[in-house]
Design a protein with these regions (language model features):
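Beta-strand-rich binding/interaction modules
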Residues: 271-273, 279-290, 379, 700-705, ...
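Amphipathic alpha-helical substructures
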Residues: 268, 466-474, 503, 598-599, ...
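Zinc-dependent metallopeptidase catalytic helix centered on the HExxH motif
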Residues: 489, 493-496, 542-608, 670
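Aromatic/His-enriched, Gly/Pro-containing loop or helix-boundary segments
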Residues: 292-323, 327, 531-554
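Hydrophobic helix-coil surface modules that form long, contiguous segments used
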Residues: 224-228, 232-259, 265-271, 276-280, ...
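Acidic/His/Gly-enriched intrinsically disordered linker/tail segments
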Residues: 458-461, 550, 580, 584-656, ...
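N-terminal, polar/Ser/Thr-rich
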Residues: 11-257, 284, 356-360, 705
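Glycine/proline-rich low-complexity spacer/linker segments in large multi-domain proteins
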Residues: 231-234, 311, 315-317, 323-324, ...
């Protein structure tokens, strides 16, 4: 927990400061004088219903004048509690059954730790008083305080950003959240959330530690009852960021020190701002219009797992409330270790999209200045404005004058290949030296001495076999540099023909250790495996599909993200499959142009095979969940389900859609998709309606509702069985 106070400026009451709110939230603890024996106490948070059948209920002490916590314990003779939840859709009932073995949740629990900023405390107090004067049991309260305060504090540390933001922003209790950590008698510990400000207000799930990894398994997540009766509405962002000016210094020890200035416009009056940044970065100071602001940057395992993007939230409280619809300059000073060395001056950038503060990935313009050791090459998105040496440093200024969602950089000791095609330029960089993880291991060769001459054959002396270490040939990390550059330039040109121009005129491609890639606007991170001669790749990636993936698909897929993910985007996890499926199928369109339809059929057959693989419980990977579950598919029982379903099944959906529309209509639809949703987020249903516009006349599923219900919103792969007699 880090709290950086500002000097109190006249007129701001001390009660409203971030420092006091954080101290009160974590230090309030439980109130032994507010402990009650309860029987048949029940309440509901929309679809979630809780029953405190028999046990003790203790409230937390007030924080900023409001109670935000309570604990129920049924750990007494006959004690018990129960939670009941009936998911409203078949898909969500299947999800719940996948994790719990039952489609409806009716779980008895031993205890419940409650944290809330809604009216839960008042609701429970009213129920207690409605049965006459409630009987306090202070002795039990003292025991519960000793037992449960450490547990409550641990949970509050995870949720304090939201608790304090709600308290300081003075939101009405109707917009507050509710959280329950339950100790189930059969299902173990699990979490229940109700958040009226979320797109899906009800979430039930469980933190799982497995094979040195931590997961949050979403058992179910859906729109709450009262919200289902309303027309769906997007929740507007609290503020908009229109411009970034970032000055970053990379020290010789690889520590990154950054000053970020952002133009922020609150949509309404704001007393607190919530930003996100990589947990590897520490925010040291924030100023708003030059005035110091307070910072709260806690660690929060549970909430970070649920967020699913690797970022962590932090709070900023200005010296005085901000006015709505007015632009402010917010200056952040932050530092951290987001760059590591993979050996031989090959570097890995860990926080590629979150090394500076952001909030919801706004489309913004960027001015970037990087200061770094001059013996290194640093690449980033945007056009170079100035590049000079300053003693031991190199200073590079870049400008991104088109609104994009992310700024990113990479560095190393690089060789470069530059190709221009029409109005676009492709610059591809490769490492000059091989990273440690790709170095071939020395092999032992046994040297046998020559046979003995005839006159010594009577000797019983054994031949002296000598093991000699042999260094195998070292792969060239830039073996395919020219080929990769040429192919990316061709892919960019091919895609621009159908999708329109990419967001930036220069596309920079640079290597990253690992077996993945990532496409940012104007900057692609490409696996170092893609640069190697196929014959010199590690044995683990030498099968037919892996060779095709690293040689033909990966760089085209990341190039396609210039359109799908960076020009057109999505805002919610339910729709993220669209960007990966579109990017991957765009790569296959380019593969088809170069290698023919059979190459695409081979890839699709591999995708089908992977979708039909079995999980530990014997079910097919495809059955873990539908495409629209997005990040929810990262489940502990099948860690690879997310990638297999989102990429492989998503690509199949695009292929089947192409077959329904026909090539000409399908490509025209993709071009219209870019034009209609440029610099906007698209939903799955909007994509369905757009695709339906391009169906041939008389198509039997004119709105594609049956197609999407079967392949996007549901699971299952049809099986064809032929019988003859």
């Amino acid at each position: 927990l880090r709290i950086l106070p500002f000097l109190l400026i006249g007129g701001l009451p001390a009660l409203a400061t971030l420092e006091s709110a954080a101290r009160e939230t974590l230090g309030a603890g439980l109130d032994p004088q507010q402990c009650y024996r309860v029987r048949d106490l029940h309440f509901a948070r929309e679809d979630l219903r809780f029953y405190f059948t028999d046990g003790y209920l203790i409230f937390g002490r007030p924080v900023q004048g409001r109670r935000v916590a309570a604990v129920f314990s049924g750990e007494t003779e006959g004690g018990d509690g129960e939670v009941v939840l009936f998911p409203p859709t078949v898909a969500e009932r299947r999800s719940l059954a996948f994790f719990t073995g039952t489609p409806n949740l009716m779980e008895h629990f031993r205890s419940a730790v409650l944290v809330f900023t809604d009216d839960t405390a008042e609701l429970l107090e009213r129920q207690l008083k409605s049965r006459g004067e409630p009987v306090r049991v202070e002795e039990a309260g003292l025991l519960m305080k000793a037992q449960w305060e450490p547990v409550l504090r641990n949970i509050l540390e995870s949720l304090q950003v939201r608790v304090i933001a709600d308290l300081l922003s003075e939101r009405p209790q109707s917009e507050g959240f509710f959280y329950a950590a339950l100790a189930g008698r059969k299902l173990g510990n699990f979490d229940c959330f109700y958040d009226p400000r979320g797109r899906e207000q009800i979430i039930v799930g469980q933190v799982v530690f497995r094979e040195n990894r931590t997961f949050f398994d979403y058992w179910t997540s859906f729109v709450a009852r009262s919200f289902r009766r309303r027309p769906p509405a997007e929740i507007p962002p609290d503020y908009v960021i229109s411009h970034y000016r970032i000055q970053a210094t990379l020290e010789p020890d690889l520590k990154l020190r950054v000053v970020t200035r952002a133009r922020v416009t609150p949509q309404g009056p704001a007393r607190v701002l919530v930003f996100q940044i990589s947990p590897r970065m520490t925010v040291r100071e924030v100023r708003i219009q030059g005035e110091p602001a307070e910072i709260l940057q806690p660690e929060s395992l549970r909430v970070n797992l649920m967020r699913g993007d690797g970022n962590a939230a932090f709070l900023v409280v200005p010296a005085r409330p901000l006015e709505g619809r007015r632009e402010y300059e917010v200056e952040f000073r932050h530092e951290g270790a987001v760059v590591s060395e993979a050996g031989h001056r090959v570097y890995y950038v860990g926080a590629r999209g979150s090394w500076y503060p952001n909030a919801g990935l706004h489309f913004a313009r960027y001015e970037l200045t990087f200061r770094y050791p001059k013996e290194l090459n640093l690449v980033a998105n945007g056009e170079v404005v100035e590049d000079l040496e300053d003693g031991p440093w190199r200073v590079t200024e870049r400008l991104i004058d088109t609104a994009v969602r992310l700024a990113a950089f990479n560095l190393g000791e690089y060789a470069r290949e530059r190709i221009s095609r029409g109005n676009f330029t492709v610059e591809v960089y490769a490492n000059r030296r091989l990273e440690r993880g790709l170095e071939p291991r020395p092999q032992q060769v046994l040297i046998v001495p020559p046979p003995q001459p005839p006159w010594n054959r009577g000797s019983r002396q054994q031949p002296n076999v000598v093991p000699v270490p042999i260094e195998p040939p070292r792969p060239d990390p830039a073996a395919r540099l020219q080929q990769v550059a040429s192919e990316i330039a061709s892919a960019l040109e091919f895609m621009a023909t159908y999708f329109g121009p990419p967001p930036l005129k220069t596309l920079t491609v640079s290597p990253i250790p690992g077996a993945f890639g990532q496409g940012f606007p104007g900057l692609v991170y490409l696996s170092t495996l893609a640069y190697l001669d196929p014959a010199q790749r590690p044995a683990a990636v030498r099968d037919e599909y892996q060779q095709l993936f690293f040689s033909e698909i990966l760089h085209a897929h990341e190039t396609a993200h210039q359109w799908w993910g960076n020009t057109v985007t999505t805002a919610h996890y339910q729709d993220e499959w669209l960007m990966e499926a579109l990017a991957n199928y765009s790569a296959l369109l380019w593969l088809e142009k170069r290698k023919g339809p059979r190459a695409v059929e081979s890839v699709l057959n591999e995708y089908r095979r992977r979708l039909l693989r079995k999980t530990e419980d014997g079910t097919e990977i495809e059955s873990v969940g539908p495409l629209v579950w997005g990040s929810r598919l990262r489940v502990s029982q099948a860690p690879n389900a997310w990638q297999t379903i989102i990429y492989d099944k998503g690509t199949w959906v695009m292929h089947m859609l192409r077959r329904r529309l026909g090539d000409e209509r399908f490509l025209a639809m993709l071009g219209q998709l870019r034009r209609r949703y440029q610099y906007r987020a698209i939903t799955t249903d909007q994509f369905r309606r757009l695709a339906a516009e391009y169906l041939p006349p008389g198509f039997p599923d004119p709105q594609l509702e049956n197609f999407f219900d079967q392949w996007v919103y549901s699971t299952g792969i049809p099986a064809l069985k032929l019988e003859h007699s």
